[in-house]
């Protein structure tokens, strides 16, 4: 009887482990973006936050010489990036990320305000999961 019980438990555990591993693998995706003055940045993806940030910096440098220093990143593929650029006290851009447009905009406004920037304007939104502008 105990051997039969062990076999049943093993038979039930294997599919659960496979299901759990599949879910974890699906969540190992990070999106990152480094904004620039030309608004020509693209969203990039990687399996780690650090790798995504590094790739975003490289992608920005391929198309611009005005890349921001700090990438924005998220592992929420349903999140949104908001990109703003400011002109006072000097030209600078930043990106914020949030669960929706208003949260992302709130985040980037906070970052720029805390850094002392003013005369800022929203450049664009990007969908984290697809990279689509809008």
Which positions does each model-derived feature cover?
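Secreted/extracellular ectodomain signature
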Residues: 24-134
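Bacterial N-terminal signal peptides that target proteins for export
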Residues: 1-11
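C-terminal segment of classical bacterial N-terminal signal peptides
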Residues: 16-23
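Low-complexity, intrinsically disordered short peptide segments enriched in small/polar/basic residues
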Residues: 11-14, 77
């Amino acid at each position: 009887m105990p051997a039969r019980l062990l076999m049943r438990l093993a038979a039930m555990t294997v599919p659960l482990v496979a299901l759990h591993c599949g879910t974890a693998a699906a969540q190992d995706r990070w999106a990152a973006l480094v904004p620039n003055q030309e608004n020509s940045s693209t969203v990039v993806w990687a399996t780690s936050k650090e790798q995504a940030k590094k790739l975003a910096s490289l992608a920005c440098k391929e198309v611009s010489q005005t890349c921001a220093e700090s990438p924005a990143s998220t592992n929420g593929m349903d999140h949104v990036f908001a990109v703003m650029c400011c002109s006072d006290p000097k030209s600078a851009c930043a990106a914020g990320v949030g669960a929706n447009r208003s949260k992302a905009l709130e985040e980037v406004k906070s970052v720029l305000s805390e850094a002392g920037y003013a005369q800022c304007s929203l450049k664009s939104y990007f969908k984290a999961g697809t990279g689509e502008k809008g």
